């Protein structure tokens, strides 16, 4: 606003000062009260801090612009590099500011030309790629390989990485000294910026230090160089195609081997196998793939959003329709409208006109998109997240956008690029599948921040229009008063649904999950939403620290199994019998069923021993020549030690006569994953010494058809040696009425 309103080399008038201040206040308040940023600001997540870094680097580049011709202006560039490095330890979203920052530099240093802009964009994208892949992952990747070489030569873990880091430090020190001595300003700036970027990036060292202390919560266990590399590459989240890839109906026609994976056991790196990369039928691959997931619920949603009927094969037109209808409209523009037009409610939706849409508060417009709004039940009319902004923030922002382009096209392009890179570019990069586990509006807060800059400039636009009809100072004051209505409306509408005081649902569920369990129990939970509240209440409030929470999503990883085999808080180690080498990553990740015509039920302990055997006779050979373990049967039996059951109070006294001699069950899947193997190992060898529970929210697929031996004791099913009678109402297992009453009424 200063660059537009103030006249160069003139003392600003009162009206101009008021306009500039009001623009800043209105824009800042509008962003403060946007739905997405406000929610991020009041939850314990990384996105508020990430947005802080986005804001401060944008502020810093404009501070540099003001003094760009001064001798020491380069200090601002170095500060930006340091802040970028620090932000990497928070979230990678901040890196998307780089192209916008590069444009500011170009417009300040060079006369405008389309070729110049194109070159600047190309250079900025190269810088972005270098930071993303060359520094964040590449620095550690090279260090890990050097550390491997040193370790194989007899040195301890991290020796090679430390040597490598010292070489980098020495090279940078000499380079900076040389550039200073030879007066090579550009080289000096590049090296200093790189050095400070690395300095900020070293904040990740605390992750390694923390992991080496083996705390109870230690995701990915990044205590060696290869584990840290996997942590940085977010390998647990898998890959998705971006530029070229398969449709969901593409068949796998082959596979290639990726880089070798390593893990550390007893201070030595050992190979765990190369990553297998599937190759898909080229006839069913496309550029810009959007519909790639083969999960059945995703496939049905792809068809729904792209207009595919029946068994029709997806075409590129369907691919684009899904991109625009779901990924762009539903997963970006809907969120944009939440923040600047209004929000229907806080119920997550998947296209239903009753859940999670945008509304304006203007009846005839809302009726066009969502049907008559006057016939809604009170529960929907009075939803606290039903926020109506009447298009006011959107209209003021559009006025500011037009005014910005009219008065200062170069800087308007900077803001537009920031909007695109932190909005639309993220949509393309994330390539989201349908049925996301939560609303993802927080990922686009940077784009909403950019639009709020235009909301602020809307004040200047209105003041500029009004001063043609009245004195300039009066116009500025009137524009300020009019535009303050916008953030006021946003604050008023959002106040009740963004106040998280007394919101204890997640905490209370966690409390009830844990208190459904007997002392020293093990409880299996489904994923992040089920597990994190339990971890919080144990770690922060100290509630039921004797219970071991096992996240089934993480149980497919070797590092997590290692952790739950250690004591944590008051909880004893989980008594798995498998050794690390038997479940190390790349080993028994997937165990298929091969029918060997085994009659009847097989002892589960024998099956575990067979599946974990390294004897070639216990394996089958794939077409590629690899040997792997398999399940010879899907019918299992566990012998029940009735004395141990009674001694450990596994069942209520009145139910001891119902204890069976054997637990017999048959899995329905044609394979088991590593997590299933660990569950089977635990129930086979636990011998009823440790209570075992499954949270009621765990999916049937993870129950392994054990439901007939489940006993409800609250918000968890206990695994017991009592076979429940079939219940026509669909009730899972039996109910321990006395225990359940005690848990509900007294805990």
PLM feature spans:
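ER/secretory pathway lumenal C-terminal domains and tails of membrane proteins involved
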Residues: 7-10, 37, 42-51, 56-79, ...
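Short helix- or helix-capping micro-motifs
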Residues: 24-32, 84
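Phosphate- and divalent-cation-binding pockets in alpha/beta enzyme and binding domains
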Residues: 532-536
